[in-house]
Amino acid sequence: MTEELKLMGANRRDQLLLWLKESKSPLTGGELAKKANVSRQVIVQDISLLKAKNVPIIATSQGYVYMDAAAQQHQQAERIIACLHGPERTEEELQLIVDEGVTVKDVKIEHPVYGDLTAAIQVGTRKEVSHFIKKINSTNAAYLSQLTDGVHLHTLTAPDEHRIDQACQALEEAGILIKD
Amino acid sequence: MTEELKLMGANRRDQLLLWLKESKSPLTGGELAKKANVSRQVIVQDISLLKAKNVPIIATSQGYVYMDAAAQQHQQAERIIACLHGPERTEEELQLIVDEGVTVKDVKIEHPVYGDLTAAIQVGTRKEVSHFIKKINSTNAAYLSQLTDGVHLHTLTAPDEHRIDQACQALEEAGILIKD
């Protein structure tokens, strides 16, 4: 740690919040650690403290995002869908969805020990999809859906219901959507 | 599969919902599979379809639970807390909380690839805590908090704020609560 000024406690958390509010794209823990001149672990604890105060920060697969009311307002339509596919079709599935201008807010599976396990992946563009897939492949992380033989839920968000209808139709045609 | 009547599609889902609504305690996938005379995987898909219709079923660490309005009403107070401890203190932490009559609704950590990962463990008694810990040990599942060097969030629910205050005080005295 160089001798540059190290931001301390509450001031640091205020500054983190400011950076996140001003940023147009997600900020990773590493980027925030460098900016605040502290370790990545200190950032994880700081973000946890802010979340414990109900500050609307989410850790997405791309980094931390401040979800203010306006950002949430933009995504008025929301729908939960049930999907079934092998891990090799994850990228295809996500692309079918984002190509309709729809965001995949999360993926939910049933963990045999923990019960419902929800991951806030928050991918809405082809770039974010490929970044997410690359991260999975580079870290050898398992696809969560492998825990339940491919069955999983997604919460989809979009500016309107029509886009979600289109995404569901595309998934159905691809044999990915589980229908009643 | 014996030749007993196998419940089919939508009827089966209606029946699953009825069993869950009537049950005073969580029902496991295995129990529902036996009752409906189908495989466990069929039950996972059925529950996913019901969840996709916003039916308030959650998969907890103890099994499926139907969270009707009354059940949720009973738990009016809710608070997110930030905690830090090693995996060996998980049981102690959960006991400190449930001993105050407080329920641990979930555990949330930051997965390096998936972002926020939330597990609906839903433990509220010493019996449920020991069942959860036994399951982790018997399946060698890692504690989620091990992914973030012990830092994690819990959402606590209880009939009133006072019980949550007491639980937080106990956690603080044990050096588990991360404070501002």
Curated annotation (Swiss-Prot), chains A, B:
GO terms for molecular function: DNA binding; small molecule binding. Pfam families: 3H (PF02829), HTH_11 (PF08279). Keywords: DNA-binding, Repressor, Transcription, Transcription regulation. InterPro entries: 3H_dom_sf (IPR035922), 3H_domain (IPR004173), HTH_11 (IPR013196), NadR (IPR026043), WH-like_DNA-bd_sf (IPR036388), WH_DNA-bd_sf (IPR036390). The keyword Repressor applies. Disruption phenotype: No visible phenotype when grown in the absence of nicotinic acid. The keyword Repressor applies. Homodimer. In the presence of nicotinic acid represses transcription of the nadBCA and nifS-nadR operons. Also binds to DNA upstream of the niaP gene, probably regulating it as well. May bind nicotinic acid. This is Transcription repressor NadR. It comes from Bacillus subtilis (strain 168).
